[in-house]
Structures are given as C-alpha cells and as structure tokens.
Design a protein with these regions (language model features):
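Short, low-complexity disordered leader/linker segments with a strong preference
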Residues: 1-43, 61
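Short, well-ordered beta-strand elements
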Residues: 37-50, 65-70, 94-95, 141
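Extracytoplasmic/periplasmic solute-binding protein
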Residues: 141-145, 150, 176-224, 231, ...
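Extracytoplasmic/periplasmic substrate-recognition and gating elements
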Residues: 237, 244-248, 284-311
Length: 311
C-alpha cells in the first residue's frame, strides 16, 4: 500500500486490538481521507517490544493484512526517525509504539489519527491510568500496551558473589551498602548505571514523595519547583552520593549493546525500572538467562513502593 499525501496520520500503540482498528489508518491518495478496509493489504508498524512479532503474525492470520514490523530503535532514537519521516512527508509508519509521554507532542502537531470512535467501550479493558495516558484533549490516539509499576531487577549471580541478599534490600541506605560490596568485586562492577534518563529522575523523585508540581484551580497554569521539594532533595542526595563515590556506571549509554552486555556479564548488576523490562532482557540480554530476578523496589525509608516508570 503506497501513500503520496504530504503527511499521514499515525496511530500510536503496540496492542493487537489497535492493529485491528488501523485497517483504515492509511490515506487515500486523492482525498487525503482514511482509506477503506478493503483497500488495505499491508501496514507498517514501528515497535521495539519483542512480543509484537507474534502479535503481527496472529493479526495477519486473522485479517489477511500483511504487517511490516520494524524495530528502528527505542525511545528517542525511534522518535527522531519518526519526526524526520513526518516532516519529509514519506516513510512514516501506520502504527508506532511510543511511550505515553510522547503522545501529546504528536497530537498537538496533528500527526496522530483520532480513533475515539473506534475505541468505544475499550476503557473497560484497562486500568484508569494507562487508559487516560492515551488520550489528549478528550480524544483517544492509541491503545495502552502496558504500564510500568517500578520493580527492582537484579543479577542474582553477582549479588550472591558479593554476599548481598537483594530480597532484604528495603531502603536506599541498604542499596547503597550493597553498591559498595558489588563495586568491591572489581573496578568495572557497578550496582547499576545512570543513563541520564529524565523519566528515571521523575520516577525516583515520585518514589521519594516528591510533589514539585502545582496546578492553578482553573488548570491554566502549572508551577514547577524542583529546588525546594523535600522528595526531590531526598532522591538527589541519595543518588549524588552513589555518583560521588563511583558506585554507578555513568559511561555506558542506556539501551545500547554495551548496556545489555553489562547485564549479561554482571558488570551492570541491577536496574530500577518498569515492570515491562523482562521482555527486553529476554530479547537483548538472552545470554544472561537464569541469572536475573525481580523483587520489590527499595524506598528511601522502607515504606510501600508507589511509583512507575515508562510504559
């Protein structure tokens, strides 16, 4: 299926239900209107989530529509290519997996397909948070693929070698103590890495109880104060201590081959991230199979975990 219009609307998600509804997500070359289902023989999907390979096969078997599934990179790597394709007026996919935070930026520019009328009743399939995250200005632009309650993933082989029981790490002070023991295994061993991800900062400050955002009563103004929030300071003090003492890898780029290699060989021994991570470990750090475990996130004071990351 070919498109000749300057821009085409993109539906953003990775869920199989959405794939079923984008049979009309292409553009009619004459009118620029969505093509009819009967015209569609192939759709292009950009996604990095490995389980979608089987979803695409099942979709083709069900509908007869071929799915050209491409992994063009994760996060900003994909978004850069997406932006370039949209600007060029060609090469953009029909469906793209993106994180929830990216939906508004594309919706504002008119790059997304409004699928509100195609998703009536779908909200019952999802919890309120993820469902609200695919909406902007009262319109639905995708279907949730997952949500990201935070979890503590760790390489048990490395933790055992360092004499650390990850299941007993309940506070950030205990995590700091574990970081020192793991780094003692060798100069290239780190309890985790710092990839400079702003989403990680948001999640960890949230976990520390931060509320640096204030909204006016009419919702027209938002004030952000990161310098005086107690939760922000709690996290930044903790994390800065790890950085100052060289206990965190700051040189390996997140989601790179070296990053996943570190998870396989144990030099990056744990991750604080969303509960969606297992599929990525299985796909990109397969040689580490059997070494990794997951447990509850430690918190500043050992209280209940209440944060999320990505999705």
């Amino acid at each position: 299926m070919k498109f000749t219009v300057a821009k085409k609307a993109i539906a953003l998600t990775g869920a199989v239900a959405m794939l079923g509804s984008v049979a009309a997500c292409g553009s009619d070359t004459a009118s620029g209107k969505p093509a009819q289902d009967k015209d569609v023989t192939e759709i292009t999907v950009w996604a990095w989530e490995p389980t979608l390979t089987q979803v695409a096969k099942d979709f083709t078997k069900k509908t007869g529509i071929k799915v050209d599934l491409k992994n063009v990179g994760t996060n900003t790597k994909e978004y850069t290519q997406l932006d370039n394709a949209i600007e060029a007026g060609s090469g953009a996919p029909d469906v793209a997996q993106v994180e929830y935070y990216a939906i508004p930026q594309y919706a504002i520019k008119g790059n997304l397909l409004d699928i509100t009328d195609k998703t009536s009743g779908y909200s019952d399939f999802y919890t309120p948070g993820p469902w609200a995250s695919v909406q902007f200005a009262g319109k639905v632009y995708g279907l949730p693929m997952d949500s990201g309650p935070m979890a503590f993933f760790y390489n048990k082989e490395v933790f055992d070698k360092a004499g650390v029981d990850a299941e007993q790490i309940k506070t950030w002070d205990q995590y700091y103590d574990a970081a020192k023991k793991i780094h003692a295994l060798g100069d290239n061993y780190y309890i985790t890495s710092d990839t400079g991800d702003a989403g990680f900062f948001d999640s960890m400050t949230w976990l520390a109880g931060a509320k640096p955002f204030q909204t006016s009563s009419d919702g027209s103004e938002v004030t952000v104060n990161l310098t005086e929030d107690k939760g922000v300071k709690t996290f930044t003090d903790f994390w800065q201590k790890l950085l100052d003492e060289g206990l965190v890898d700051t040189k390996t780029a997140g989601w790179s081959e070296d990053w996943f290699k570190g998870m396989v060989d144990g030099t990056i021994a744990s991750l604080f991230t969303g509960a969606w991570m297992p599929a990525n470990l299985a796909n990109s750090a397969a040689d580490g199979a059997g070494k990794w475990r997951v447990t509850q996130m430690p918190t500043a004071d050992g209280s209940t975990t209440n944060s999320e990351n990505g999705g």
